[in-house]
Amino acid sequence: MTEEKIQSYRKKIYVIRQKLKAKKPRFLRYDSDKFFRLGRQEKWRRPYGRDNKTRLKVRGFPAIVSVGYRLPKEVRGFHPSGLRQVIVHNVNDLVKVQNQKDSVIVTIASSVGFKKRLEILNKARELGLKVSNEGVSA
């Protein structure tokens, strides 16, 4: 594929992804708007109550997490920039991704420490890779 075709394909996928994500509701815990302690937890917990209207999928109540909300496989795993996101744990992982630098953005894993993070950042700059969560000035 030529560079123009790749760019247009990437842009097309990004637009599709944004449209689908806009339709998807924000899944919050039931009654999180009524009780502060639940609202703080801004994470989904499945309702199991006998008469819970959300669990029963009654109209007018929040949507419940289900399989149908998942994005298509071609669109999944993209960074907002439209590039494929790759998680990196060490410098060797960077070398593996080096030949795809036009279509990939690197994310340094959260478990990586400060020293190794600096090594990864320096190597990424050498190889000309984009890093999404630099966060540290090396």
From Swiss-Prot:
Pfam families: Ribosomal_L32e. InterPro entries: Ribosomal_eL32 (IPR001515), Ribosomal_eL32_arc (IPR023654), Ribosomal_eL32_CS (IPR018263), Ribosomal_eL32_sf (IPR036351). One of its GO terms (biological process) is translation. SUPFAM superfamilies: Ribosomal protein L32e (SSF52042). PROSITE patterns: RIBOSOMAL_L32E (PS00580). Keywords: Ribonucleoprotein, Ribosomal protein. GO terms for molecular function: structural constituent of ribosome. CDD domains: Ribosomal_L32_L32e. The keyword GTP-binding does not apply. GO terms for cellular component: cytosolic large ribosomal subunit. Belongs to the eukaryotic ribosomal protein eL32 family. PANTHER family: 60S RIBOSOMAL PROTEIN L32 AND DNA-DIRECTED RNA POLYMERASE II, SUBUNIT N, RIBOSOMAL PROTEIN L32. HAMAP family: Ribosomal_eL32. This is Large ribosomal subunit protein eL32. The lineage of its organism: Archaea, Thermoproteota, Thermoprotei, Sulfolobales, Sulfolobaceae. The gene is rpl32e.
